[in-house]
Design a protein with these regions (language model features):
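Bacterial Sec-dependent N-terminal signal peptides
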Residues: 1-23
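Active-site-proximal flexible loops/turns
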Residues: 9, 66, 272-274
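Hydrophobic alpha-helical membrane-insertion segments
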Residues: 11-12, 68, 407, 414
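Outer-membrane beta-barrel porins/channels
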Residues: 20-34, 39, 117-421
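Outer-membrane beta-barrel translocator/receptor signature
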Residues: 37, 49-58, 64-151, 246
Length: 421
């Protein structure tokens, strides 16, 4: 079960982190080994064991342990259950009182493989060697958190307006500039929401300076202070993530005197990751929000009321890479097994696309609006770090075994490279 805790003070940034950030680099570098039913039942602690096609991605030497032909196919289901609950704000008020659970189930194929074994007929030295091809899942991206509740203290679109004001004061634009598409080129992707929000009416110019903004869910009282409605706003946050990371492995193994087992992998990685997230705010009582629009030509004023607003962010990332891996298993004493493997860094060739949209609804539909923008595909390289696997196991004849594994990877070695083309 995946448990997600969300604080709505920061939720407007939902999904807005670029796929070229450290969090994404870590996500795409980590391995959540899957494999066959046998290896998963052992928690994939197979570095020192081998003998199963699900273990080849962990230690290539494992293919030489099983002195027979093998074919495996492992279907599965991937379950995701997300639970969300709000936290108490500094003033003692809880905006999201109830727990919300949301689940998602997907079919998966953790392992598919074949291995051929060739006996040399010798009693010592190279007694047999193997050749195999294995497909192993190393990550499943599957989550769908959902959070909702009533908030009288903070507004996501108020925060969007505050961000627009900060950018305007830093000289990136004035309100008039936000109608020019070139403004997107000046901003980071996570700030595109400011442009779509302004064009849709989710935020608006406040005053005449062109550098002050107000959110659709806010109003200015008689003293000039910006406030939320007395009855607050209903907020909803949702996110759906899907995708996978799969290794396609060509393997060769060798058994030396039933004591030393060697193996080597040439691996290709295929990655797909898609995320769609949104935050929506609705007025509990639209009469709390008197929104005044002023006609720039006539000076006439029109009063309408805020109904709802929604901001969405989507990202789609794909990648392909290659790596090499070498492994060894040694059986120095009957029952004792020691294994180790080392994998080269993986150079991933990545492509990412992002989309942002904003919607604003007023009770006078003439003032409602929608705006969306999608980025061109960006191409770059991601180098994931080298990793090493160590394992030790003890077998009790045909009665059972104990196995322990340790994987070492220096994630500070994650690097991005710009595409020269």
């Amino acid at each position: 079960m995946k448990k997600t805790i969300i604080s709505l003070s920061f939720i407007l940034l939902c999904g807005a982190a670029s796929a070229q950030g450290f969090d994404a680099g870590l996500l795409f570098s980590e391995n959540d080994y899957q494999g066959t039913a046998r290896t998963m039942a052992m928690g994939n602690a197979f570095t020192a064991l081998g003998g199963d096609l699900g273990s080849i991605g962990i230690n290539p030497a494992g293919s030489a342990v099983a002195r027979c032909y093998q074919f495996t196919i492992t279907p599965g289901l991937d379950f995701s259950l997300n639970g969300t609950k709000g936290s108490v704000t500094p003033d003692g008020m809880s905006s999201f009182q109830n727990k919300v659970y949301n689940g998602r189930t997907r079919f998966a194929l953790p392992n598919l493989g074949i291995s051929l074994d060739f006996n040399t007929g010798r009693r010592r030295g190279v007694m047999n060697w193997s050749l195999g091809f294995v497909i192993n899942n190393t990550a499943q991206y599957n989550s769908s958190p959902l959070a909702m509740g009533t908030n009288k203290n903070t507004s996501a679109f108020g925060q969007m307006a505050a961000r627009a004001q900060d950018l305007a004061e830093d000289g990136y634009f004035t309100a008039a500039d936000l109608f020019d598409d070139s403004v997107y080129d000046k901003l980071a992707i996570e700030d595109w929401r400011v442009v779509t929000g302004f064009r849709s009416g989710a935020i608006a110019q406040n005053g005449s300076s062109g550098k002050e903004f107000i959110g659709i869910s806010e109003y200015t009282d008689e003293s000039g202070k910006i406030k939320l409605g007395q009855n607050g706003i209903r907020q909803t946050y949702g996110e759906t993530t899907s995708g996978y990371k799969t290794d396609y492995i060509i393997n060769a193994g060798m058994n030396i005197s039933d004591i030393v087992y060697l193996g080597i992998n040439l691996g290709a990685v295929r990655l797909r990751h898609k995320s769609d997230s949104y935050i929506q705010e609705e007025a509990v009582d639209p009469e709390d929000f008197d929104i005044v629009f002023t006609d720039n030509e006539t000076g006439g004023k029109t009063v309408t009321h805020f109904i709802s607003a929604k901001n969405t962010f989507s990202s789609s990332t794909s990648g392909n890479g290659v790596y090499g891996k070498f492994g060894i298993i040694v059986t120095p004493y009957r029952g004792l097994r020691i294994g180790a493997a080392i994998q080269t860094p993986t150079m991933m060739f990545m492509a990412s696309t992002y989309g942002v949209s904003s919607t604003a609804k007023y009770d006078l539909n003439a003032y409602s609006g929608y705006e969306e923008v999608e980025s061109a595909t960006s191409h770059y390289q991601l180098r994931t770090p080298m990793r090493a696997n160590f394992g030790i196991a003890w077998t009790f004849g045909g009665y059972g075994l104990i196995s322990a594994d340790y994987e070492l990877s220096d994630y500070s070695g994650i690097r991005y490279f710009e595409n020269k083309n």
